[in-house]
């Protein structure tokens, strides 16, 4: 009889822990958004989760949500919908995408600066519920980013959800379910996600499968190389958008105006070309 009571108590404790909300959960949800992606005809393709990592609207999500998309929107915690402006980087192998949303003044999550050790508590915060587990094993990516294996498998609805430590700091994103375990990708892997003139094979594959505007590379020299390659592959309207953003970002660079003037000449917009040449 005592044995049955003991087992019942253990089960009740397990259920209580699974359903318990960490103290920081309500605050964290203010930085979590819902994502909708759309096809070329404006039809809804997929829905997922994203979370903001800076005040200017930079966010991270599961790449699979964006694969094949021509447009995306995010709905913040207040229920307001915002367009995704640019893709800032993506990786096919590790299924992570970084993007900029047309939203200002968001409260970003604080990213954990240190790796979590085996046995550390991990809290996965979904749209409505939270699951807690602990770190069962770890492996390294590129020698500096951690790939965590958890002590349990979460529901597929948590794919792409943010994962926190006991301090409420952002550790990673739910990446995959394999066997009886869920795996979490280190948030800091987002540091590798950027737009480059010559991207890696994994980044190139991911970016080619997202039919949305990408941000410019982070420095002028590489951005000029990026412009050159895009002049060979982008449509006139796409290329004009890229050149316009380049001249806005680097207004002192004469090369940007020259390239735009060349495009205007090709489009027979001679007055606009003349403005850029003078």
Each model region followed by its residue ranges:
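Bacterial Sec-dependent N-terminal signal peptides
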Residues: 1-23
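Flexible, gly/ser-rich surface segments that form the specificity/activation loops bordering the active-site cleft
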Residues: 21-26, 106-159, 174-185, 196, ...
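C-terminal cap/linker of serine protease catalytic domains
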Residues: 22, 173-238
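A short, Trp-centered hydrophobic/proline-enriched beta-strand micro-motif
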Residues: 26-39, 124
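Conserved active-site neighborhood of the chymotrypsin/trypsin-like protease fold
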Residues: 54-123, 128-132, 144-147
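Short, glycine-anchored, charge-dense loop/turn motifs used at functional sites
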Residues: 56-58, 163-172
